[in-house]
């Protein structure tokens, strides 16, 4: 038989069950045949007492057929149980709808506080292991590293190679200027010395008398 969740094909109708049997008991009883999705025991609207009828929804059709064949005409706590594939009365969608029990402070089976239906003292088959809680996928906010904006600086460093080259050029230029300065200074000194010698050198004046004797003048 093909699988797939189809309430009209994978729901078992169980009747003549003990009135004291709870939803948890039916779940535990039918779980041996396959994955049980939901158990609903029909209760009186006013007294909330069981009417001895239950619907068990399985995950697949094969499990439902196995359960119906095994439980049909079986003695259960002194009562002859009847089981068959449930006939769809058009309310399958309503039946499959999951109920959310927001109040977790009290048991929905007996209404008492301090325990849940899985561990209710009224369960004839004892406690049932609660289904694993579905972990809610929390959207983790990926904390992106803060982008540190670089501070604007007016004093930007130059390339070391360019810096050393400029220093060499400047040094060479300074040497050239220094040499040129020295040359100019030496030329000026030489010019001044020559002028000074010419000034102090005695000049020979010819005698007015055209004599062979020369007169020295300062």
UniProtKB/Swiss-Prot annotation:
Domain RRM intervals: 10-88
Chief localization: nucleus
Keywords assigned: Coiled coil, Metal-binding, mRNA processing, mRNA splicing, Nucleus, RNA-binding, Spliceosome, Zinc, Zinc-finger
Pfam family, any one: zf-CCHC
Basic and acidic residues bias spans: 175-187
Region (Disordered): 122-218
Name of this protein: Zinc finger CCHC-type and RNA-binding motif-containing protein 1
SMART domains reported in the protein's UniProt record: RRM, ZnF_C2HC
Superkingdom classification of source: Eukaryota
Alphabetized CDD domains for the sequence: RRM_ZCRB1
Subunit details: Component of the U11/U12 snRNPs that are part of the U12-type spliceosome.
The species this protein was found in: Danio rerio (Zebrafish)
InterPro entries attached to this UniProt entry: Nucleotide-bd_a/b_plait_sf (IPR012677), RBD_domain_sf (IPR035979), RRM_dom (IPR000504), ZCRB1 (IPR044598), ZCRB1_RRM (IPR034219), Znf_CCHC (IPR001878), Znf_CCHC_sf (IPR036875)
UniProt GO MF annotations: RNA binding; zinc ion binding
BP terms from Gene Ontology: mRNA splicing, via spliceosome
PANTHER family: ZINC FINGER CCHC-TYPE AND RNA-BINDING MOTIF-CONTAINING PROTEIN 1 (PTHR46259:SF1)
Cell compartment(s), UniProt: Nucleus
Biased composition (Acidic residues): 146-161
Zinc finger (CCHC-type): 105-122
């Amino acid at each position: 038989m093909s699988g797939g969740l189809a309430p009209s094909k994978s729901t078992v109708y169980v009747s003549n069950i003990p009135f004291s049997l709870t939803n948890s008991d039916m779940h535990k009883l039918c779980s041996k045949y396959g994955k049980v999705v939901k158990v609903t025991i029909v209760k009186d609207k006013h007294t909330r007492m069981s009417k001895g009828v239950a619907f068990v929804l399985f995950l697949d059709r094969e499990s439902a057929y196995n359960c119906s064949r095994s439980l049909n005409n079986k003695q259960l706590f002194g009562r002859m149980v009847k089981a068959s594939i449930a006939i769809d009365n058009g309310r399958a969608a309503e039946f499959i709808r999951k109920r959310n029990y927001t109040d977790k402070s009290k048991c929905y089976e007996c209404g008492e506080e301090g325990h849940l239906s899985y561990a209710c003292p009224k369960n004839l088959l004892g406690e049932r292991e609660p289904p694993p809680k579905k972990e809610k996928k929390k959207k983790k906010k990926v904390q992106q590293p803060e982008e540190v904006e670089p501070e604007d600086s007016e004093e930007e460093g130059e390339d070391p190679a360019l810096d050393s080259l400029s220093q060499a050029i400047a040094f060479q230029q300074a040497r050239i200027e220094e040499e040129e300065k020295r040359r100019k200074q030496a030329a000026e000194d030489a010019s001044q010395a020559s002028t000074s010698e010419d000034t102090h050198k005695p000049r020979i004046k010819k005698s007015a008398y055209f004599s062979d004797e020369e007169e020295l003048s300062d």
